[in-house]
UniProtKB/Swiss-Prot annotation:
Residues carrying the site annotation Transition state stabilizer: 102
Organism: Pectobacterium atrosepticum (strain SCRI 1043 / ATCC BAA-672) (Erwinia carotovora subsp. atroseptica)
InterPro entries: Arna-like_SDR_e, Bifun_polymyxin_resist_ArnA, Epimerase_deHydtase, Formyl_trans_C, Formyl_transf_N, Formyl_transf_N_sf, Formyl_transferase-like_C_sf, Lipid_A_modif_metabolic_enz
Swiss-Prot/TrEMBL site (Raises pKa of active site His) positions: 140
Entry GO terms, CC: membrane
Name of the protein: Bifunctional polymyxin resistance protein ArnA
Active-site residues per Swiss-Prot or TrEMBL entry: 104 (proton donor), 441 (proton acceptor), 626 (proton donor)
Length: 673
């Protein structure tokens, strides 16, 4: 059986060796180049493959069409992935005749995602394991071939637990690979209701919160001790790395040093014991940032620790300057939800401008949120000053409702292109990073099954179809921004939302004048008891994305770890939530009829079909489907949407129904005056 292998880490080497022993013909191995600065404590897949005389490659983007075509030419029977760090596209997963299989370091469906060995220790689990499963478009979600349980002991660290998982993986593969080769496997679907997902960990995640229990802190230390960067805290401004520790119960702590409520206080220095939110922690070994590995008591002496001194978070003493984010259009749908997400992270400070503040009123008292009421076409000097002052610029102001494209095409062009071009040029002038909202509309009438940021054609209609003014305005700005990046070094990311929806999307008043998104218009029809108008029968399909999924992806774009989003175009949508507008209406009706406030509103008036020209006006043209490829989002952001459409529809409907002022109807218990 011909196999293509994607592998990294020790488990990758174990997988290669197991395949060779099972008699597979390994056609090629794809791995990663070792990242500079990363502690490489594990064996090399490249060296293992070279020892087998197997071709080995380390492409920067394995999902690029060039690599997909090269793999297609090899015509593999099967694909295996062993700890490969990049999510493989559907184009690759569909190539092998017998499917693709992944070995994951947990007992799926629990601990999907990255760093499962570290996360199970952080969370205090008593067992984990390895799972061999079929690969599908959603990471770690395919049917299970087999699993092997690994017990977690109290003294296990990430390194020792990884060794246990490596042994379990070798045994599991020795059992299952011959069955796959003979095509005799049995598959068990995963129970998604039991699934949990965890993202990648960074060195910063090792910061100790002394308010937690000693048991929880010790779990963190075990999870990130050598060869990982280690758990750490601060004595004043000096970093202290803790490599080993043990829990000290309350009844074993010196009664002269009560620690309840004094989390982070040093109780004694020999041994070095620190109070926690519950119990205390003895530091067995550690080091200062520039020092040597040593015992806890010697570390205390070297750093001048004394009883009752406090260990804690450097950020509470020496505040690193927060990233300043300028959001133009901060009161809009994306703007206000993004503000909420950024304010949950202490690293960000937000400056916002908009013509109103109803949606962001809840943030106005936050000291990290600065708002000015104004218009981007008027407040040019304020905008230029704040572009100079801020680090990341998000110009979210645009006319983005279809009826306006035909009703006010010149106004759409003036605002969406001309005013935003000024902002782009200021970002170039002051060397600021811009995160620009492109749109799924730029793909126009593209006939690809999935719209790909890097390969899909951007096709629009004839000039007399003014409906395309929005699409071409955005597309032209995309091209200008790209050119500024290539010629002037502008740091940018273009993100393309695909039909985001959720609470605070529009207002029902906007729907009353026809200037809203589809779901808001449909909700207005239900609230008022008017017929739901389905343009051209509502057959057009869209992929609807929950606002919380979308905002989490956008937050990661702003975060931009290791600069990986610079110069990139990223679709942000949910290809699994595809539905026609008619299906959206039917889903809304079902949720509406089940809502506890249903009896306050008129009876449903039915669906009626209308022609697009009569609804949107002359010059309108629609598209049959709009489905995103999200391979860039998966690769660059380690992001995948999770919220089902039914949940989003229900939450959006609930939000609007609770904003409607319905006259009170007296019942039998009311007093008649």
């Amino acid at each position: 059986m011909k196999a293509i292998v994607f592998a990294y880490h020790d488990i990758g080497c174990v997988g290669l060796e197991a395949l060779a022993l099972a008699g597979y013909e390994i056609q090629a191995v794809f791995t990663h180049s070792d990242a500079p600065g990363e502690n490489h404590f594990y064996a090399s897949v490249a060296k293992t493959a070279a020892g087998m005389d197997v071709p080995v490659f380390a492409p920067e983007d394995i999902n690029h069409p060039l690599w997909v075509n090269r793999i297609r030419e090899l015509a593999p029977d099967v694909i295996f992935s062993f700890y490969y760090r990049t999510i493989l596209s559907d184009d690759i997963l569909q190539l092998p005749s017998f499917g693709a299989f992944n070995l994951h370091g947990s007992l799926l469906p629990r601990y999907r995602g990255r760093a499962p060995v570290n996360w199970v220790l952080v969370n205090g689990e008593t067992q984990t394991g390895v799972t061999l499963h079929k690969m599908v478009s959603r990471a770690d979600a395919g049917d299970i071939v087999a699993q092997s349980v690994v017990a977690i002991d109290d003294e296990d660290t990430a390194l020792t637990l990884h060794g246990k998982c490596r042994t379990a993986a070798a045994t599991l593969l020795a059992q299952q690979l011959p069955l796959i080769r003979s095509r005799e496997i049995a598959l068990t679907p995963q129970d998604d209701s039991q699934a949990s997902y965890f993202g990648r960990r960074t060195a910063a995640d090792g910061l100790i919160d002394w308010q937690k229990s000693a048991h929880e802190i010790n779990n963190l230390i075990r999870a990130v001790t050598e060869p990982y960067p280690g758990a750490f805290t601060f004595l004043g401004e000096r970093k202290v790395i803790i490599w080993r520790a043990r829990v000290v119960k309350n009844n074993r702590v010196n009664v002269n040093h009560p620690h309840g409520g004094d989390a982070g206080s040093i109780i004694s220095t020999s041994p070095l014991v620190v109070s926690c939110g519950e119990d205390a922690l003895e530091i067995v070994s550690g080091q200062s940032e520039a020092g040597l590995y040593m015992s806890g008591s010697r570390l205390a002496a070297e750093m001048g620790m004394v009883p009752q001194a406090r260990l804690g978070n450097l950020a509470s003493r020496v505040q690193r300057r927060r990233t300043r984010v300028l959001i133009l259009g901060v009161n809009g749908f994306i703007g206000n939800h993004l503000t909420e997400r950024l304010l949950r992270d202490d690293r960000y400070e937000i400056y916002g401008l908009d013509i109103s503040s109803d949606a962001i009123a809840r943030f106005l008292g936050d000291p990290r949120f600065h708002f000015v009421e104004g218009d981007i076409s008027i407040h040019n000097e304020w905008i230029e000053y704040h572009i100079k002052k801020c680090d990341v610029i998000l110009p979210l102001v645009a006319i983005a409702t279809p009826i306006e494209y035909t009703r006010n095409p010149l106004r759409v062009f003036e605002l969406d292109f001309e005013e935003n071009l000024k902002i782009v040029r200021d970002c170039v002038r002051y060397n600021k990073r811009i995160v620009f909202p492109s749109t799924s509309e730029v793909y126009g009438m593209c006939d690809d099954k999935e719209f790909d940021e890097d390969t899909s054609r951007l096709i629009v209609g004839p000039i007399n179809k003014q409906r395309w003014i929005y699409s071409v305005s955005k597309q032209l700005l995309d091209r200008v921004i790209w050119a500024y990046g290539a010629k002037n070094g502008l740091r940018f990311t273009l993100f393309r939302p695909f039909n985001w929806m959720g609470p605070r999307l529009d207002t029902l008043d906007a729907a009353r004048i026809g200037s809203s998104r589809a779901i808001t218009q449909l909700i207005l029809n239900l609230v008022e008891g008017s017929p739901i108008k389905l343009v051209d029968g509502g057959a057009q399909k869209r992929c609807f994305t929950d606002i919380h999924d979308g905002i989490e992806a956008l937050f990661r774009v702003i975060e931009n770890r290791n600069g990986q989003c610079d110069g990139q175009i990223i679709n942000i949508g949910n290809p699994h939530n595809e539905a026609s507008i008619r299906e959206l209406g039917e889903m809304l009706l079902t949720s509406f009829n089940a809502h506890p406030l249903r009896d306050r509103f008129p009876p449903f008036a039915g669906f009626i079909d209308v022609e697009s020209s009569s609804y949107y006006g002359k010059g309108y043209q629609d598209v049959a489907h709009r489905t995103p490829s999200i391979r860039n989002a998966k690769r660059l952001l380690e992001w995948e949407p999770t919220v089902k459409m039914e949940q989003t529809v229900a939450e959006t409907l609930d939000y609007f129904l609770r904003t409607v002022d319905v006259p009170h109807t007296a019942d039998a218990t009311d007093t008649q005056g």
